[in-house]
Amino acid sequence: MEKTFNLTRRDDGIAILTMDVPGETMNTLKAQFGPEISEILAEIKSDSSIRGLVLISGKKDSFVAGADISMLDACKTAGDAKALSQQGHVVFNELEALTIPVVAAIHGACLGGGLELALACHQRVCSDDGKTMLGVPEVQLGLLPGGGGTQRLPRLVGITTALDMMLTGKKIRPKQALKMGLVNDVVPQTILLQTAVEMALAGKRAPKPVKKSLVNQVLEGTSFGRNIIFDQATKQVEKKTQGNYPAPAKIIDCVRQGIAKGMQKGLEVEASHFAELVVSKESEALRSIFFATTEMKKETGAEGASPRKVKKAVILGGGLMGGGIASVTTTKAKIPVRVKDISEKGLSNALAYAYKLLDKGVKRRHMTPAARDNLMALMTTTTEYKGVKDADIVVEAVFEDLALKHQMVKDIERECGEHTIFASNTSSLPISQIAEAATRPENVIGLHYFSPVEKMPLVEVIAHAKTSPETIATTVAFARKQGKTPIVVQDGAGFYVNRILALYMNEAAQLLLEGQSVEHLDKALVKFGFPVGPITLLDEVGIDVGAKISPILEKELGERFKAPAAFDKLLSDDRKGRKNGKGFYQYGASSKKAKAVDESVYGVLGIKPGTNKDAKAVAERCVVQMLNEAVRCLEDGIIASPRDGDIGAIFGIGFPPFLGGPFHYIDTLGAANLVKILESYQSQFGNRFEPCERLKTMAQENAHFF
């Protein structure tokens, strides 16, 4: 059996320990490595000719990407998970206890257990390459660093910086890592090994004191000050997580106890807390999302089809969506883009939008001005169909007008090649209707982005009956290159995301008209786990946009999609939301720093906010509508699987990740329980709450999605 760790000795007394997991593109730490590492460390200790040790990766662009997450699923009990953490502690403590200098030479991803391995070394040097990132992202999986990270990181970079890294899971770039004292040096990759060897030859050095602000020096230097840091961190965490995620509080406790009672006690607490989190329902849900997205990356979206390479893209429309799509195509996919708009103003807006996003990177020193300018050079513009003939894909982002989109299809078929894909960014019009104008309907597909494009990770790839498998596969690959998570959905009004969102939003509107206040509604759903409440979301998306989509959904899908008529009064009062500074909340000069409701909205709607219902009951009424419709979408074949439905809801509308998505959450609730809740609401409020057939069948059979 091939080994993962190989020790080679140099003539100068420095040994190189190379980690290279056989048959894998990236290094990950596995439980079975423990004995192998211990054996090598024993060999090093017994060889007096070894004066120093350099730990390096044999992989091209990865140091260690973290622990193998599948190990956690093998843990049947908290005791199994605790043993896993303790095994890591034993190995890393052995490494740290070596009397010779140990240097980690880092190039590429150094994350999670990989960074904990590097922290157990006496010094660290990393490459200045863009692929090099350091971090402890375990919190994003509902976990904490279980290999000593909660103890070694605060001692190296300070409590405040360490908590920030562990509570956010952020990735640190090389220069930032040097500045914060996480690494001792940053060098070009070409001299990484040489530098690490020189550091090992120079011997162990006491770590440089971390540069801290005066406030942090004072706070971290006394037990009273440290308590202030921990208390503030706890308050911020509670506000952000609404008590829905247990990991952050446990991370704070590990650091607090380790600093107060010593490293040994800290490691004991870390192992116990890690074990509790591994078997928590929140971490299981978050890990299911991780596995789902990893699995989806291997799929083409159309079985048996291979994607064609996209060498050039055209974007029709220079508005917010068009500008955003053009921007991610050049900056993330590195694909040349031609933006076409009928007005010079639209084109200059698209260029300005892309420049502004790139310039943020320059200001944060994430890229050089030259790199920004090179990426901007990939974007060109035209008011006519010039320079579009060789486009492999055309993304249409014009107004939601069927006649206009028909004209775009005809123009593109006339101006471009026979293989050119026409992808419409429509949010509501059926793709089959857009394809009616095409002589090559197999090339027509939907590609629905969410706003703002550069931030929202999801895209819906919408296939109509005649879309070819190659068109689907090429569009999915194109979206992935843009840094997006694509889900393939079938054609139908609202597709998947807007369809499940519409009923949720409509129910929130009904509750508002029944007398629930705007703040109470929003707070109830944020407490449930959504990033923003439904009324805030309506203001952000645009009340006018909601008003355009609702009739389309009602016409195609039936009475249950009928929006409350009272909302027409908002448009009559010129309330569109944030975009025109007039909606449910105050904007502009009249708004205070804390978001305040525009109380005049109640008068416009002809209601008085009365006694607020229990927040859980408010959230339940909105959420069960979304759950029921998600199952209906599966029933109708709009989505291919519960997995796709979970990913679409989490990445498209911020469904609470700790619940795992609508389908995982239904499994947690139980189909029979959900049917009972829906039928109770149906008896009170009518047939919009009628459970779909699949749910009823599942309730009878006590079935699950996963």
From Swiss-Prot:
Chain spans, region 3-hydroxyacyl-CoA dehydrogenase: 308-706
Entry function: Catalyzes the formation of a hydroxyacyl-CoA by addition of water on enoyl-CoA. Also exhibits 3-hydroxyacyl-CoA epimerase and 3-hydroxyacyl-CoA dehydrogenase activities.
One Gene Ontology MF term: NAD+ binding
Pathway annotation from the record: Lipid metabolism; fatty acid beta-oxidation
Organism per entry: Shewanella baltica (strain OS185)
Family, per entry: In the N-terminal section; belongs to the enoyl-CoA hydratase/isomerase family. In the central section; belongs to the 3-hydroxyacyl-CoA dehydrogenase family.
Site (Important for catalytic activity): 116, 138
This protein's GO CC annotations: cytoplasm
UniProt-recorded name of the protein: Fatty acid oxidation complex subunit alpha
Keyword vocabulary terms for this entry: Cytoplasm, Fatty acid metabolism, Isomerase, Lipid degradation, Lipid metabolism, Lyase, Multifunctional enzyme, NAD, Oxidoreductase
Organism classification: Bacteria, Pseudomonadati, Pseudomonadota, Gammaproteobacteria, Alteromonadales
EC identifiers of the protein: 4.2.1.17, 5.1.2.3, 1.1.1.35
